[in-house]
Amino acid sequence: MPTGTESAHAASFDELQRDLPALSPRALRFRAQAAASRAGALLSEGLRVGHEHGFDSGPFMDHVYANEPQGRTALGREIDRRLLGRRTCHAFREIRVLAREALTEAAAASSTPEPLIADLAAGPAPYVFEVLSAHPGARALLADIDPAALAQARAHAERLGLSDRVTVTRASAFDRDALERIDPAPDVVAELGLYGIYHDDALIERHFVDLAETIAPEQIVFNVQTQNPEIEHIARVWRDHRGERCVWRLRPVESILEWAAAAGYEPASIRADSYGIYRVGRLVRT
């Protein structure tokens, strides 16, 4: 099965949004890789989960985090091993650790011994639950627009015995009215995996201002995808949880820091995975 690693052509974000000419060599190559990926889903557990739930979904990320090749037959497990060995999947696993470290530092640096951590695009919220388990005084508010992700987060909280410390609500991170309704205001805001799926720079820039003018958290923990040699393969072959192409926006971390500075935040730490695909940052209010 083709691995579809680095693309010889570094496609821009605008190019990734457009379909390729139907008979161009690149279109034919990615079409063949997409067909191979769908066929591989009959054998590889990771590809099956990705095609069934989306390659940006909680179930797929859980499979990546587990990092245990699974499949029907030895060939299926080998296909799965290659999937899990992608640079992007390596980066996913590394940023989970980096995000946990940044959130743990944020909880420890909070001005209160019982910090409230708000994840505004929580999904199943694996990072937050790991921090709550290690920091008995911390509490969490988990918000998302996806009811299925919130149901998964509730179930996870119950399994871990953390339901009394976790509040789950359906809301958009970019809804200023929803931010104004958050009470009490969180001490730490986590925005992990949020910026890459929203393509409008002005939306994110305004979001930092909205955060500062509404809940004004002491700290913000974020991640941003800055470069990825597999970005075109992901956009042409993978599908997201809505069945649409996985077109992710790459941004320099400097852009995030500039918008944060304008809203009154400065970096306390910036970490990178070993491939330099992601940056994980912790911001503090100035």
Protein language model regions, located:
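Conserved SAM-binding loop
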Residues: A153-R154
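A short, conserved alpha-helix within the catalytic core of class I
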Residues: I197-D210
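A conserved beta-strand element that flanks and buttresses the S-adenosyl-L-methionine
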Residues: A190
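Conserved SAM-binding loop of SAM-dependent methyltransferases across substrates and taxa
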Residues: P124-G137
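Conserved SAM/SAH-binding beta-strand->alpha-helix loop
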Residues: D146-A148
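Conserved beta-strand signature within the Rossmann-like core of class I S-adenosyl-L-methionine
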Residues: A216-Q225
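Class I SAM-dependent methyltransferase Rossmann-like catalytic core
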Residues: A41-S110
